[in-house]
A protein has these predicted regions:
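P-loop NTPase catalytic phosphate-binding loop
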Residues: 1-103
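Phosphate-binding and hydrolysis-coupling loops of NTP-dependent motor/remodeling domains
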Residues: 7-9, 27, 50, 84-85, ...
Length: 162
């Protein structure tokens, strides 16, 4: 993706997602989780530039068209995925498209459980230097953790959970 190009932002989510409360116009396109694979595949045929694809609760999004898997493998170089999911829901999905994303060992774990979330992207320190309150956790780049504050409790209340 060229640094000068601003990507379209597409989102995949269902009615249980906090993204349903996003202000109008935040996303260029929105896809329902249940049929997202086919819809995104069709939309990619018309994409005129780079795309940032946000997928909330990726563990609940199937990929019968293998489009998400193809994006992760680099078949669509101008399309990038940011996917969310709970580690306990993602871990048992051995043949799911999200497994390929986890192999990059790059992501974030918010308020991690050190007993169950230790291996999502890399090793989480057993003891945090501060309390891991709302929005706090670790970001990983190639398996190396960095303590982060991704949002504040006030943001969560004002934005309907976003």
């Amino acid at each position: 993706m060229d640094a000068a190009e601003v990507p379209e932002v597409w989102a995949v989510f269902d009615q249980r997602s906090g993204l349903v409360n996003a202000p109008e116009g935040v996303f260029d396109r929105v896809f329902e989780s249940k049929n997202a694979s086919a819809q995104v595949q069709a939309a990619l045929q018309d994409a005129a530039g780079p795309v940032l694809l946000l997928i909330d609760d990726g563990d609940r999004v199937d990929d019968p068209m293998n489009v998400f898997d193809a994006i992760v493998k680099g078949d669509f170089p101008d399309v990038h995925i940011i996917a969310t999911g709970k580690p306990t829901d993602l871990r048992p999905l051995y043949s799911h498209w999200t497994k390929a994303i986890r192999k990059f060992r790059t992501g974030a774990v918010v308020q991690p459980n050190v007993d169950t979330d230790m291996d999502m992207f890399g090793s989480i320190p057993r003891r945090a230097p501060v309390q891991l309150s709302v929005g706090r956790g670790y970001a990983f780049l190639a398996g190396s953790p960095v303590l982060v504050q991704l949002m504040s409790p006030e943001d969560s209340q004002h934005r309907g959970g976003l």
